Amino acid sequence: MSQLLLFTILVFSSVFVIGSLSFIPPPHPFDPLTEIELNLVRNIINERYPIGLEHRFTFQYVGLNEPDKSLVLSWVSSQYHNVKSPPRQAFVIARDHGKTREIVVDFASQAIVSEKIHVGNGYPMLTIDEQQATSELVLKFKPFRDSIRRRGLNVSEVVVTTSTMGWFGEAKPERLIKKRPFYLNGSVNTYLRPIEGMTIIVNLDQMKVTKFRDRFTSPLPNAKGTEFRISKLKPPFGPSLQNAVLFQSEGPGFKIDGHTNRWANWEFHMSFDVRAGLVISLASIFDMDVNKYRQVLYKGHLSEIFVPYMDPSEDWYFRTFFDCGEFGCGQYAVSLEPYTDCPGNAAFMDGVFASQDGTPIKITNVMCIFEKYAGDIMWRHTEIEIPGLKVRPDVSLVVRMVTTVGNYDYIVDYEFKPSGSIKIGVGLTGVLEVKPVKYVNTSEIKEDDIHGTIVADNTIGVNHDHFVTYRLDLDIDGTDNSFVRSELVTKRTPKSVNTPRKSYWTTKRLKAEELLVVNPSRKTKHGNEVGYRLLHGPASEGPLLAQDDYPQIRAAFTNYNVWITPYNNTEVWASGLYADRSQGDDTLAVWSQRNRKIEKTDIVMWYTVGFHHVPCQEDFPTMPTLFGGFELRPTNFFEQNPDLKTKPIKLNTTPTCTARND
């Protein structure tokens, strides 16, 4: 670290400790809140409300208050950012004596500038602290301990996790959660040894167990076969894989300045939010023909992950999780491991969020950035009559985050290509949610439907869905965009055309609500509207729940893969600002019923990647990664192939590989 930088940090810290009238905000309006800012928010609010669980005032969410978009774009477009930066503020959701408060803190004035009490349905996302506190509460609860002993189990080997309650028609549901016990005793794979048949409900505002019942139902699955640690597994082992390393003799091709990344012809900003996790903003691509960067994506991030299970029994019907809105996809983001989660050429960045009492918590290596080359071809061509060929390797830049919400791990990738494409992918791995049964073979099953698959002795992997919804504020060459669809239709060849062909297909443009975002005010030299096309990838299934089923009412945003809404900085979370125990009255599906203009205006695309997961034995004890995603691909955005003038990669030495003869 340079002496100048070190001195700046020391002075900066000293200013904060003394009293931060000279508080200096981060250089970029989209930079995530820093540890200093989070501490400042805590101190400012603490002057009005005593903080801490004993005072019943807790921070449920602290994030950057969305700055005015016009001010951000004005700041970005100024050559040296010499216009005034948008006001920097924090948005806080807190619980205070059974009420939900929304507070806005302004850093310039170091004061609360807005405050109101939420009076609608739903509750804010759970904190890690209150989940841990309720687990300890249950473990000390005498009726629970007695039940564990009556089952012949050791209380010290029991762990307790949290499930949200969902909503099933209650007029004004309380802030309750369900707690679920699991048994270790020979396994670290917690979720594969559920202690089924217990109903444990905890009131979060009162911090007490309000309902307990033990029905002593199913047997406990055996610990055998649940191990996944290589150090504990026994031979024979699988094939040895050679380490595949991308060697960059001249170093990485990207440059990170603060939270801004510049690579090839791309420039974009990376941030972190406790609910969304990784956030990509202000993605622009350089166009050589006009010698400037052109806008593509103003902001993109995870909005929600809806995971409903398909077992209607008492122990399972409520398992209809909203991972981002109830638990926080950023709150449960994990530290990435170099060389395994990310390749050896990756750079890493940390993330920070506020704990329940407002103090900062750092997640080291919460995101990684790396150049990816898997042997794919960017473009190539061979002319038979002309010696030689032209080919370019397909190198891309990936920004990655992994969030582990309960038993599932989600690998979230944003992949930028020199062609102008942005590929957004999500990988599902981790551990199944399982149900203990008396069966060990399908021949023993008596019921019509066991709601899953026998994956091990006395163990059913329960059928479920994953719906991963993204919010994508696309600004294709500006903010005045429209959404259209190009439909393929069959047309008979006119007899007047001298050809032996009888048919062909062409495009017929319809104004609709899927597949293509264009800017009607920007056209190519040949008159085509500049745009970006949405290409569906693997996993684009829709919901199969009845639309009047309570979970689907709350998750009606999954009814379609694609939604288009006009830009509104309050419409960020597809499940609503308050997802826990919500009633579906403030979701993307509700906003879309307002019938607002989506032509030649600032619009937002919402896309849902959908998986129907019928578990199989290969998913046990850990699940091989299953990928889905989609691509945003330039369509008449450029005058020609932007990769055409990409220079070939020069190799200083030619690598040689020979097959092993073992």
Swiss-Prot record:
<feature type="binding site">
    <location>
        <position position="602"/>
    </location>
    <ligand>
        <name>Mn(2+)</name>
    </ligand>
</feature>
<dbReference type="InterPro" id="IPR000269">
    <property type="entry name" value="Cu_amine_oxidase"/>
</dbReference>
<dbReference type="GO" id="GO:0009308">
    <property type="term" value="P:amine metabolic process"/>
</dbReference>
<feature type="binding site">
    <location>
        <begin position="321"/>
        <end position="332"/>
    </location>
    <ligand>
        <name>substrate</name>
    </ligand>
</feature>
<keyword id="KW-1015">Disulfide bond</keyword>
<dbReference type="InterPro" id="IPR016182">
    <property type="entry name" value="Cu_amine_oxidase_N-reg"/>
</dbReference>
<feature type="modified residue" description="2',4',5'-topaquinone">
    <location>
        <position position="408"/>
    </location>
</feature>
<dbReference type="InterPro" id="IPR015798">
    <property type="entry name" value="Cu_amine_oxidase_C"/>
</dbReference>
<dbReference type="GO" id="GO:0048038">
    <property type="term" value="F:quinone binding"/>
</dbReference>
<keyword id="KW-0732">Signal</keyword>
<dbReference type="Pfam" id="PF01179">
    <property type="entry name" value="Cu_amine_oxid"/>
</dbReference>
<dbReference type="GO" id="GO:0009753">
    <property type="term" value="P:response to jasmonic acid"/>
</dbReference>
<dbReference type="GO" id="GO:0005507">
    <property type="term" value="F:copper ion binding"/>
</dbReference>
<dbReference type="Pfam" id="PF02728">
    <property type="entry name" value="Cu_amine_oxidN3"/>
</dbReference>
<feature type="active site" description="Schiff-base intermediate with substrate; via topaquinone">
    <location>
        <position position="408"/>
    </location>
</feature>
<feature type="binding site">
    <location>
        <position position="464"/>
    </location>
    <ligand>
        <name>Cu cation</name>
    </ligand>
</feature>
<dbReference type="InterPro" id="IPR015800">
    <property type="entry name" value="Cu_amine_oxidase_N2"/>
</dbReference>
<feature type="signal peptide">
    <location>
        <begin position="1"/>
        <end position="22"/>
    </location>
</feature>
<feature type="binding site">
    <location>
        <position position="603"/>
    </location>
    <ligand>
        <name>Mn(2+)</name>
    </ligand>
</feature>
<feature type="active site" description="Proton acceptor">
    <location>
        <position position="323"/>
    </location>
</feature>
<keyword id="KW-0464">Manganese</keyword>
<feature type="binding site">
    <location>
        <begin position="405"/>
        <end position="410"/>
    </location>
    <ligand>
        <name>substrate</name>
    </ligand>
</feature>
<keyword id="KW-0801">TPQ</keyword>
<protein>
    <recommendedName>
        <fullName>Primary amine oxidase 2</fullName>
        <ecNumber>1.4.3.21</ecNumber>
    </recommendedName>
</protein>
<dbReference type="InterPro" id="IPR049948">
    <property type="entry name" value="Cu_Am_ox_TPQ-bd"/>
</dbReference>
<keyword id="KW-0325">Glycoprotein</keyword>
<dbReference type="Pfam" id="PF02727">
    <property type="entry name" value="Cu_amine_oxidN2"/>
</dbReference>
<keyword id="KW-0560">Oxidoreductase</keyword>
<feature type="glycosylation site" description="N-linked (GlcNAc...) asparagine">
    <location>
        <position position="154"/>
    </location>
</feature>
<dbReference type="InterPro" id="IPR049947">
    <property type="entry name" value="Cu_Am_Ox_Cu-bd"/>
</dbReference>
<feature type="binding site">
    <location>
        <position position="466"/>
    </location>
    <ligand>
        <name>Cu cation</name>
    </ligand>
</feature>
<dbReference type="InterPro" id="IPR015802">
    <property type="entry name" value="Cu_amine_oxidase_N3"/>
</dbReference>
<feature type="binding site">
    <location>
        <position position="473"/>
    </location>
    <ligand>
        <name>Mn(2+)</name>
    </ligand>
</feature>
<keyword id="KW-0479">Metal-binding</keyword>
<comment type="subunit">
    <text>Homodimer.</text>
</comment>
<dbReference type="GO" id="GO:0008131">
    <property type="term" value="F:primary methylamine oxidase activity"/>
</dbReference>
<feature type="binding site">
    <location>
        <position position="475"/>
    </location>
    <ligand>
        <name>Mn(2+)</name>
    </ligand>
</feature>
<keyword id="KW-0186">Copper</keyword>
<feature type="disulfide bond">
    <location>
        <begin position="342"/>
        <end position="368"/>
    </location>
</feature>
<comment type="similarity">
    <text>Belongs to the copper/topaquinone oxidase family.</text>
</comment>
<dbReference type="InterPro" id="IPR036460">
    <property type="entry name" value="Cu_amine_oxidase_C_sf"/>
</dbReference>
<feature type="glycosylation site" description="N-linked (GlcNAc...) asparagine">
    <location>
        <position position="568"/>
    </location>
</feature>
